[in-house]
Structures are given as C-alpha cells and as structure tokens.
Amino acid sequence: MILVWKPLALEDRVQIMEFIGADNPLAAIELDLAFESKADALPAHPTMYKPGRVKGTREIVVHPNYVMVYAITGKTINILRVLHAARQWP
C-alpha cells in the first residue's frame, strides 16, 4: 500500500510542532516522530485502528492529546488530518 500525507495533515503537523516546540523542542520532535512511526506502520495493518467519526475514515490515538485521521482508498492510505483530541472533528 502507498502512504500519502495530505496537505492539511502536513500543515497540522507543522502547527503542532511550532506550538509544542515553543515550550519544549524535544517533546515536539518526539511527538512528530510518533506521528511518523504510526503512519509508517499503517501499510502493514491498515484496518488495525478504530473506525473514525467521519464515515470512511479511521483514527489513531498517537498521544492522549492527538489523533491522526486517515482513509483507505484502493491501495492508498491517505493521512487526512492530525488533530488535538479536544478539537471538534469534523
């Protein structure tokens, strides 16, 4: 399977890194590595995580405060968003 980070998800990652990195650069890097690690594992087990709140999506709790939303389309896994758990989605 092919893994694709959609533009909004990449933008989310940058904003999260900037926000956390302002106070704790090391924590920001560790969290971003966790996003990358979870995403990289998806092609092996794409349906491992729970169905999302939006039909056709799945959600990974990467950290108690952050959820990664993805969708599977054919042979492609699209990372759609990386959101704070308290954020309203959709």
Language model segments and positions:
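Flexible, active-site-adjacent loop/turn segments at secondary-structure boundaries
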Residues: 46-47, 58, 81, 87
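Absolute protein N-terminus
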Residues: 1-2, 90
